[in-house]
Amino acid sequence: MLARLVPGLQVSAYDYIQASRLRARFTREFITGVFSRVDVLVAPTIPEPAPSLAEAKSGTVDDVVRRMGRFSRLTRTISTFGLPALSVACGFSTRGLPIGIQLIGRPFDEATILRLGHAYERVTAWHTRRPPL
């Protein structure tokens, strides 16, 4: 894990500030491009079905880190942009494991995604089902 953090020490203050400015520009462009047309963006929470618990724990530490990186790639971007998001259950995979969708809102508009998530759960029953253990 330390080996993955050490390269960050090589980033200069100038490069860090430039990257922060670039992130701010991408964030503005994303927000303007998406939220000028919709109130909420709906996307998968993770890009592939969840593994079994045994599969999730298998492999080396690097394997687990890579797996978590794959799973978080759709939520990580939204977090980087600082947007509010809520994941709600929307079904089960063919293996019987839960699948989620994320509701993504405008900056500081948590109320809208919470209302939408609540409304979704009132008309579906996915949040009441549990996978077999």
What is each PLM-predicted segment?
Residues 18, 51-72:
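Short, surface-exposed loop/helix-turn segments at secondary-structure junctions
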Residues 113-133:
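Short, gly/Ser/Thr-rich active-site loops of penicillin-recognizing serine hydrolases
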Residues 1-28, 44-48, 87-97:
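Short helix-loop capping/hinge segments that flank enzyme active sites or metal/cofactor-binding pockets
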Residues 39-41:
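Short, Asp-centered acidic motifs that coordinate Mg2+ and/or phosphate
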Residues 88, 97-106, 113-114:
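Short, well-ordered beta-strand elements
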Residues 26-37:
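Short amphipathic alpha-helices and their capping/turn segments at secondary-structure boundaries
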Residues 31, 63-88:
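Small-aliphatic-rich amphipathic alpha-helix that forms the alpha element of a beta-alpha
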